[in-house]
Amino acid sequence: MESIEKKEIRPLFIKERIAVYVYCYSYKGTRQLSKFGDVVYTSQKSNYSLLYVNNENLSDLLSKLKDLKFVKKVRVGHIKELDQNFSEAFAQTNLAVKEEIERL
């Protein structure tokens, strides 16, 4: 019981994470990528891996990844830059469909 009470309880904060695509020369080195972040997907055929890493140390991590022998290129995902509010696009599509129906 005492060991449970001594453990520190960490708060459940969600950290900003970003997708990083790592293109490799061969499939062999992809196992080493788990040191840098969470490997979500690895393609044997296309020789790339998808990592999720913390946004805080992104620049340091990118330079470390580029320095690895088996890495061809590193790309950062752009999902944060995109507008994820689709209500406007949905309204425009509805208007276009209604106009098409009225023409018929």
UniProtKB/Swiss-Prot annotation:
Give its localization. Cytoplasm
Q: Which InterPro entries match?
A: DUF2129 (IPR016979)
Q: Does the keyword Cytoplasm apply?
A: yes
Q: GO CC annotations? A: cytoplasm
* Principal location class: cytoplasm
Could you tell me the keywords of this UniProt record?
A: Cytoplasm
- Entry keyword annotation includes Cytoplasm: yes
> Belongs to which family?
Belongs to the UPF0298 family.
Q: What is this protein called?
A: UPF0298 protein YdgE
What does UniProt list as this organism's lineage? Answer: Bacteria, Bacillati, Bacillota, Bacilli, Lactobacillales
